[in-house]
């Protein structure tokens, strides 16, 4: 395990998650926000589902990290290297999804991953 990620990896193995507040700088987050509002392909492929209470949520999903803003962020060494340290080997970006809703409006997404 790379020494620089050992504390984060220990937390991941203990808790099942790790929060890295400095992973993206504010300018990178803003680029993602802008891309989410301007990406016609992502917006065009969005669909609605009902949550467990019947309220509607809108989401978009894709299976490969492309050459767009989201794909480039997913391939950043500071992202990939951490995940490889957490999981103990090479990783493959299999699937992405984005919940496309305003805060406090519409349904809720119950995250579940096995």
Specify the residue positions occupied by each region the protein language model found.
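Non-heme Fe(II)-dependent double-stranded beta-helix
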Residues: 1-15, 20-113
């Amino acid at each position: 395990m790379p020494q620089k990620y050992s504390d984060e990896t220990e937390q991941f193995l203990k808790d099942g998650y790790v929060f890295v507040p400095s992973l993206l700088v504010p300018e990178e987050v803003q680029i993602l926000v802008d891309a989410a509002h301007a990406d016609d392909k992502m917006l065009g492929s969005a669909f609605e589902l009902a949550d467990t209470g019947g309220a509607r949520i809108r989401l978009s999903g894709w299976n490969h990290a492309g050459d767009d803003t989201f794909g480039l962020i997913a391939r950043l060494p500071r992202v990939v290297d951490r995940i490889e340290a957490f999981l103990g080997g090479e990783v493959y970006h299999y699937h992405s999804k984005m919940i496309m809703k305003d805060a406090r409006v519409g349904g809720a997404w119950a995250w579940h991953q096995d």
